[in-house]
């Protein structure tokens, strides 16, 4: 095992227009999670960049630390006894850019590297989905590009990934306050209108087609939504 390992994980945008809980894409803004082996001192965690002084450095309470421990458990091997894990965060917290997914995926990848690489991409995505509760941010954080994802009743995740046109640029607009995912979802209705469901099925087909076929004139139509944006 190398003495030093660094993992980069991108920001993600999910719930894209009509692709609520189904579509997510990776952005060119990255967090880094690194491990540096030491001879003593146990495992310590350092936070740099965004969230410094706010994100806990308690290894067992930090999302990255929890994900690393999960990877070690799945692989059946212990993490190194000594080392410094440094989180360098560029992704804003609680702004809809997948900061928690980046932490989970980064921790799983780093933990997997440190415990024998026993998990493949499918297993890492499965564990990330279990920790996050859904794959729409975790999938593009791990696989990149535009991802369509579904989870069946047995928690099995199926993903279709598409490479995006390198000439595309994305602009993100974030609120000047933190909005937790749980709070945002709390305003959604428990049931939806049949016609709203049909509307979204039709429009998400246009949205995916716009990206795949580079028909960006269809984006305005494909982004229309009746399941979450009105709320």
Where on the chain are the PLM-derived regions?
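Short, charged, solvent-exposed linker or helix-capping segments at domain edges/interfaces
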Residues: 43-47, 97, 161, 182-185
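ATP-binding N-lobe of GHMP and related small-molecule kinases
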Residues: 1-95, 113-119
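ATP-dependent small-molecule kinase catalytic core of the GHMP/sugar-kinase superfamily
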Residues: 119-231
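DPxDG-like acidic metal-binding loop motif
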Residues: 29, 97-120, 142-147
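Charged catalytic carboxylate motif
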Residues: 63, 106, 203
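Short, basic/glycine-rich phosphate-binding loops at helix/coil junctions
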Residues: 45-47, 107, 217-223
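Short glycine/threonine-rich catalytic loop with a Thr-x-Gly-x-Asp
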Residues: 95-101, 194-199
């Amino acid at each position: 095992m190398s003495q030093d390992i660094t993992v980069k994980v991108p920001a993600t945008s999910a719930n894209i227009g009509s692709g609520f809980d189904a579509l997510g894409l990776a952005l060119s803004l990255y967090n880094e999670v690194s491990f540096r082996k030491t001879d003593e001192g146990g495992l310590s965690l350092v936070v740099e960049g965004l969230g410094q002084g706010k994100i806990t450095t308690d290894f067992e309470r930090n999302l990255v630390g929890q994900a690393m421990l999960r990877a070690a458990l799945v692989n059946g091997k212990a993490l190194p006894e000594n080392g410094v894990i440094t989180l360098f965060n560029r992704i804003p917290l609680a702004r809809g850019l997948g900061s928690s997914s980046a932490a989970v995926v980064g921790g799983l990848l780093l933990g997997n590297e440190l415990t024998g690489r026993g998990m493949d991409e499918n297993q890492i995505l499965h564990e990330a989905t279990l920790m996050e509760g859904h794959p729409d941010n975790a999938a593009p954080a791990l696989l990149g590009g535009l991802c369509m994802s579904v989870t069946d009743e047995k928690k099995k995740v199926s993903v279709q990934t598409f490479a995006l046109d390198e000439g595309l640029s994305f602009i993100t607009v974030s609120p000047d306050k933190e909005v937790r995912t749980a709070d945002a979802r709390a305003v959604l209705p428990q049931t939806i209108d049949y016609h709203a469901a049909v509307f979204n099925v039709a429009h998400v087909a246009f949205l995916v087609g716009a990206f795949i076929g580079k028909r960006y004139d269809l984006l305005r139509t494909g982004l229309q939504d009746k399941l979450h944006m009105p709320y």
